[in-house]
Regions:
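Asp-based, Mg2+/Mn2+-dependent phosphohydrolase catalytic module
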Residues: 1-33, 137, 141, 153, ...
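Active-site neighborhood of HAD-like aspartate-dependent phosphohydrolases
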Residues: 12, 16-35, 40-75
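Hydrophobic alpha-helical core bundles mediating ligand binding, dimerization, or RNAP-core interactions
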Residues: 48-56, 73-77, 95, 99, ...
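Short, surface-exposed acidic
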Residues: 60-71, 106-119, 175, 207-208
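A metal-dependent, Asp-based hydrolase signature
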Residues: 79-121
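Short, acidic loop-to-helix structural element flanking the phosphoryl-transfer center
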Residues: 92-93, 120, 124-153
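Generic recognition of short, well-ordered alpha-helical interface segments
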Residues: 94-98, 131, 193, 259
């Protein structure tokens, strides 16, 4: 395993299928389909909600009038995790910041050590709730059937070891030829550089066919990929209404939209097959 990629090994813990070879139609390099991880393959948002609700029960926090707990925790995650991606906080620092702000909203003040311990307790509940989305295995099967020799990879914003632990826990590690994480590279989605780094990895290990990227964030994932020259697919699981300017840019770049991985796979087979 390199500093920012995980080599595929025979077998697959989710579907039992072997990792695909690079053979495709005669004279045609195999296509590459890259995925985001959180809320694309893994049901991250659901795990977060289950984790924070369990943590609140254990800490015996009283309800706060007008405070939506899952919404607050999601907003804190967005704010502080993006500060980490921007280099304003360390990985552990963004965790402590989320813990401090959430606890303070419930009347508890935490110093750094206490905030770290608070987050560790929450994280155990979050980790216990990790699950793959129900359409993941079907998507792999459909892509393999419709795109012979298709190669799979992951591009994710986060620390490599943490994201690899998720893939391993979910039984998905075997599926991917390369896993590219922003924490190992120093730049993050939507920077075109991270998408191009992934493409270079695949070019080094086999003939390179057309490359697509599937992710749940329109700007960060689909538009970012399209601006790097990939086919961007926005996995809009929650039927979100995009910002008009981003929607216009997505149309200009040829971004595809799907509400499930089943739909995304059908679109990719149609475009790349």
């Amino acid at each position: 395993m390199s500093a920012s990629s995980a080599a595929a090994r025979p077998g697959d813990a989710v579907t039992g299928a072997a990792v695909p070879t690079h053979r495709s139609a005669p004279g045609r390099p195999a296509p590459v389909v890259l995925f985001d991880l959180d809320d694309t393959l893994m049901a991250h948002r659901e795990a977060v909600q289950l984790g924070i609700e369990q943590h609140m029960r254990i800490r015996a926090y009283d309800p706060v009038a007008g405070l939506d707990v899952p919404v607050l925790w999601h907003e804190l995650e967005e704010r502080h995790y993006h500060a980490y991606l921007a280099g304003e906080l360390t990985f552990e620092g963004q965790r402590r910041a989320r813990a401090r702000d959430f606890a303070l909203a419930h009347g508890e003040s935490l110093d750094d050590p206490a905030a770290g311990a608070w987050f560790d307790e929450y994280f155990a509940h979050y980790r216990a709730s990790w699950r793959v989305h129900a359409d993941v295995a079907r998507s792999f099967a459909a892509l393999e059937a419709g795109l012979p020799g298709v190669r799979f990879g992951v591009i994710t914003n986060g620390e490599l070891d943490f994201q690899l632990a998720k893939l391993d826990r979910l039984g998905l590690t075997e599926r991917f030829e390369h896993v590219v994480a922003s924490g190992a590279l120093g730049f993050a989605k939507p920077d075109p550089a991270i998408f191009l780094a992934a493409v270079e990895r695949f070019a080094e290990t086999g003939p390179l066919g057309p490359v697509a990227y599937v992710g749940d964030r329109l700007r960060t994932d689909a538009i970012g990929a399209a601006e790097a020259g990939l086919l961007g697919v926005w996995l809009n699981r929650v039927d979100a209404t995009p910002d008009p300017a981003e929607a216009a840019l997505a149309r200009e770049l040829g971004v595809l939209e799907a509400t499930t991985l089943d739909e995304a796979s059908a679109l990719l087979v149609s475009r790349l097959g």
